[in-house]
C-alpha cells in the first residue's frame, strides 16, 4: 500500500503527514474546567498510546483553563499535544490558540449560526459577501496561530453543516467537501500550512465518499494537506468498532489518512487499541477490480476435490437455487458453512469472505465448493480462530492432500459479526441501528448508562414489536451534531442541558427539557404511539 503524499503539519512535538507515522488520538469526556479530572483522563489516554488529546472548549472559561491543564501535564514531563475543540464561538478559538498545540474549528458553525434546516436564498454577490465575512474573521485567528505556532484542524461534520452551505449545494458529499474547501482556500492564500482536515459522518458511505471527493478536490487545486479520519457517532461495543473499521479501514487501505480517531461511546482510552489495530491491518487488496463469473474458475489446490455427495454445496449463480456454502479449516485452509435461502445473501457472504475482512487474525486459504467443482482463492482472512465453534467430523476428509482435516461449523457469533459488517457498510440491515456519540465535556447526562438502558429497552420492545428492529435511533450528548445527525435517524435522544433531554423524530424536535430519569421511557412511548 502506498500512502497518499501529504505536506507535513507540525503539532507541538509531533508531525502529522509528510511521511510521519499515522497518529492516534482521542478526546476527553470530562468537564474542561476540572483541571484534575482532565489531567487524569488525558494521562490514561496517553498511557494507552494516544499521541494527541482533544478537549472541548465551549466557552472562554474552558479555553482559558487549557493553560492550566497543559501546565499540569508538562509539570509531570508529559509533552503530548493538546487540541481545543471549538464550536459556535470564533472568539474562543482565538483564546485557545494561545494555550494549545492545535485548535479544531468547525466550518459549519465558526461564523455561520447553528443550522435550523431552513433554505436560504443567495444571489452570487450575496454568497460571495458571506465568504468574505468568513475570511475577515478567520484570518485574524490564523495570525494568532502563526504567532503561537499552533496548528489548525478544519473539521467538517455532516451533522453540523450550515444552512448557508446546504442551501447553496444541497445535503450531499459535494457540499460537505465545499464546506471544507472554503476554509482551506483561505489558509492557502494566507500561506498557513500547519493544517489538518477532517470530514466525518455517522454514515460510513457518506464519510468514505466525502473524503475521497475531498482528496480529488485538493489535488485539483494542488493542495496536499494531511487528513484526520473518523466515523463520528460510531457507537459502542462491537458495533462501534465494526463501523469505525469499515469507514476508516476503507480509506486506510487506499493509502488515505494521516491521523485517526475511533469515536466510541466508552471511556476514551478504549479507543486507542482499536485505532492501533486499524493502522496495522490494511494490506493491498490482491483481487482485480474487474472479476468474471467465479463459477468459471477452477482450483488445482486440492489433490482430490470432493463431490456434492461428500459435502453440501451451493451454486453461487443466482439462476440456481442455493443450498449451502461449505468451508472447512485445516491450518491455513478455511471453509465456512452457510445455509441461506436467498442467492443474493449467499453471494454477499461469499464476497465478504473472498474480500478483505477487517477483523484481526491470521491468514487462511479460502475454498468454496460449487456444483462439484472447487473454487479456490487465497486471501488474508483476519478472523480470530476462537470465533469458530469446533466439532469433530464424523469422518475424515481430504483437504490440500491432508486426510486429517476436521469439520468446523460456523459459530453463531461469527454469523452475527458478518451481519454487523454488512450493516455497518449499509449493505443490509438486520437489527436496530444506533447512532451514538462518544460524549465530551459538553455532555451533561450519563451517556454510557443511557445507551445501555435504551438498548435494553428497545431489545425488549422488539420481542413483541418487530418494528423496533428496523429503526435507527440517535443518542447524542449535545446539540453540536445532535439535530443534524437526527436527519439520518428515525428517532433521537439529545442532551439539552444538565440532566435534561430533547426527543426528536427525524430532525424535528418533538419534546424538550425532559428530566433524564423520564426520558428513556418517554422515547419508547413516543415510538410506540408514532407507529
What are these regions (language model features)?
Residues 121-134, 166-282, 312-313, 317-378, ...:
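Catalytic alpha/beta core domains of metabolic enzymes, predominantly
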Residues 51-52, 100-116, 254-268, 362-374, ...:
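Glycine-rich phosphate-binding active-site loops on the catalytic face of alpha/beta enzymes
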Amino acid at each position: 500500500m502506498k500512502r497518499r503524499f501529504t505536506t507535513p503539519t507540525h503539532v507541538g512535538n509531533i508531525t502529522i503527514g509528510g511521511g510521519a507515522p499515522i497518529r492516534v488520538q482521542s478526546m476527553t469526556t470530562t468537564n474542561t474546567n476540572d483541571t484534575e479530572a482532565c489531567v487524569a483522563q488525558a494521562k490514561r489516554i496517553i498511557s494507552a498510546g494516544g499521541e494527541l488529546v482533544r478537549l472541548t472548549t465551549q466557552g472562554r472559561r474552558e479555553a482559558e483553563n487549557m493553560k492550566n491543564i497543559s501546565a499540569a501535564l508538562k509539570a509531570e514531563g508529559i509533552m503530548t499535544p493538546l487540541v481545543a475543540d471549538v464550536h459556535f464561538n470564533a472568539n474562543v478559538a482565538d483564546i485557545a490558540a494561545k494555550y494549545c498545540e492545535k485548535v479544531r474549528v468547525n466550518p459549519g458553525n465558526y461564523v455561520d449560526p447553528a443550522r435550523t434546516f431552513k433554505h436560504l436564498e443567495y444571489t452570487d454577490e450575496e454568497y460571495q459577501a458571506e465568504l468574505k465575512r468568513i475570511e475577515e474573521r478567520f484570518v485574524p485567528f490564523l495570525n494568532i496561530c502563526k504567532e503561537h505556532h499552533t496548528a489548525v484542524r478544519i473539521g467538517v461534520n455532516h451533522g453540523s453543516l450550515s444552512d448557508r452551505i446546504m442551501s447553496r449545494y444541497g445535503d450531499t458529499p459535494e457540499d460537505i467537501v465545499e464546506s471544507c474547501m472554503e476554509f482551506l482556500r483561505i489558509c492557502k492564500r494566507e500561506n498557513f500550512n500547519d493544517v489538518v482536515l477532517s470530514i466525518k459522518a455517522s454514515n460510513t458511505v457518506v464519510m468514505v465518499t466525502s473524503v475521497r471527493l475531498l482528496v480529488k478536490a485538493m489535488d485539483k487545486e494542488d493542495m496536499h494537506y494531511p487528513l484526520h479520519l473518523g466515523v463520528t457517532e460510531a457507537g459502542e461495543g462491537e458495533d462501534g468498532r465494526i463501523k469505525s473499521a469499515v469507514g476508516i479501514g476503507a480509506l486506510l487501505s487506499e493509502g488515505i489518512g494521516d491521523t485517526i480517531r475511533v469515536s466510541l461511546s466508552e471511556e476514551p482510552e478504549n479507543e486507542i487499541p482499536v485505532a492501533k489495530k486499524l493502522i496495522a491491518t490494511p494490506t493491498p487488496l490482491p483481487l482485480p477490480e474487474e472479476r468474471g463469473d467465479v463459477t468459471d474458475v477452477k482450483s488445482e489446490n486440492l489433490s482430490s476435490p470432493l463431490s456434492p455427495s461428500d459435502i453440501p454445496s451451493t451454486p453461487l449463480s443466482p439462476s440456481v437455487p442455493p443450498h449451502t456454502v461449505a468451508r472447512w479449516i485445516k491450518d491455513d485452509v478455511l471453509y465456512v458453512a452457510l445455509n441461506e435461502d436467498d442467492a443474493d445473501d449467499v453471494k454477499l457472504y461469499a464476497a465478504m469472505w473472498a474480500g478483505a475482512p477487517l477483523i484481526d487474525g491470521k491468514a487462511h486459504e479460502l475454498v468454496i465448493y460449487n456444483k462439484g467443482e472447487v473454487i479456490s482463492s487465497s486471501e488474508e482472512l483476519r478472523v480470530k480462530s476462537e470465533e469458530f465453534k469446533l466439532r469433530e467430523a464424523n469422518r475424515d476428509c481430504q483437504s490440500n492432500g491432508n486426510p486429517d482435516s476436521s469439520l468446523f461449523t460456523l459459530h453463531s457469533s461469527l454469523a452475527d459479526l458478518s451481519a454487523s459488517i454488512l450493516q455497518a457498510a449499509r449493505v443490509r440491515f438486520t437489527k436496530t441501528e444506533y447512532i451514538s456519540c462518544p460524549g465530551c465535556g459538553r455532555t451533561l447526562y450519563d451517556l454510557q448508562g443511557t445507551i445501555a438502558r435504551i438498548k435494553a429497552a428497545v431489545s425488549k420492545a422488539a420481542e413483541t414489536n418487530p418494528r423496533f428492529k428496523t429503526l435507527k435511533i440517535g443518542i447524542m450528548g449535545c446539540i453540536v451534531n445532535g439535530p443534524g445527525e437526527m436527519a439520518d435517524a428515525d428517532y433521537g435522544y439529545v442532551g439539552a442541558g444538565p440532566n435534561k433531554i430533547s426527543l426528536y423524530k427525524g430532525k424535528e424536535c418533538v419534546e424538550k427539557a425532559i428530566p433524564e430519569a423520564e426520558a428513556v421511557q418517554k422515547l419508547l412511548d413516543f415510538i410506540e404511539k408514532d407507529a
